Structure formats: C-alpha cells, structure tokens
C-alpha cells in the first residue's frame, strides 16, 4: 500500500487541495475541517521560490500529508527558472515532504526526481498533461 506520510492510499477517494505560499494557520485548519486529506504545494506558483522560503512554507503544513509540485511553463505551471534549478529544489525539499509530483514530459529531470524520491522511500505522482 502506498502512503503519503501517515495517510494510506487504500483505494478510497482522497481530497487534495492546492496551495501557494503565504498561507496562515487558520486557512490550513479550515481546509482540514472541510475534508482536505493532502496539501498539494504548487511551489512553481509561489511568489518566493527561494529554497529557505519554500522550506518555511512546508513547515506550516506539519502533520498534513504534503505533495510538492514544481511545474514549468511548458507543463502548465509557472516555474520561471532552469530545469537544473528545479531539480535542485526538488532534491532540497524531498526530505520534508511526503510525495512529489513531476511531469512525465520533464525528460531532463523526471528520472532524477524519481530516483531521489525512491532513495527516500517517497511516492511519486508521475503526471501527464496534454495541452494540445
């Protein structure tokens, strides 16, 4: 069975809520009250993508299963920097999150992200989006 932190993905539906940065504890608590199972941190959409800032934002979700996503513009996201910088960020945050989402078409980083996640026994959501 796959786990996102302590949350077992047992085949029952789960609710993932996307977040950008700048959330206060009350908004996170409200999402939990409304049934959120997983917080998807859309790091590509953060106003500040500095690693230290991202790690501080992750800390706000302590005790909540976290799926980290960093999509490039070609993947429908907002990451403005290089794939090398994106890979470095994934590697820096992997120990602090419960799972990562990487686009299948991210050929320059996908295998590296998957390998880094596997080394830490973290699940990977390997996404595919067709924008044609």
Language-model regions, residue ranges each:
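N-terminal amphipathic alpha-helix/helix-capping segment at the start of soluble metabolic enzymes
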Residues: 1-26
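Short, well-ordered coil/turn segments that N-cap beta-strands
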Residues: 11-15, 35-37, 62-66, 96-98, ...
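Catalytic beta/alpha-barrel core
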Residues: 18-20, 38-48, 69, 86, ...
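Short, acidic/polar
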Residues: 19-33, 81-92
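Extreme N-terminal leader/targeting regions
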Residues: 21-25, 29-61
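Short amphipathic alpha-helical segments and helix-helix/interface helices
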Residues: 29, 55-58, 90-91, 110-115
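Alpha-helix-loop-beta-strand connector modules within alpha/beta enzyme cores
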Residues: 50-74, 115-126
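Structural motif corresponding to the early beta-alpha repeats
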Residues: 65-91
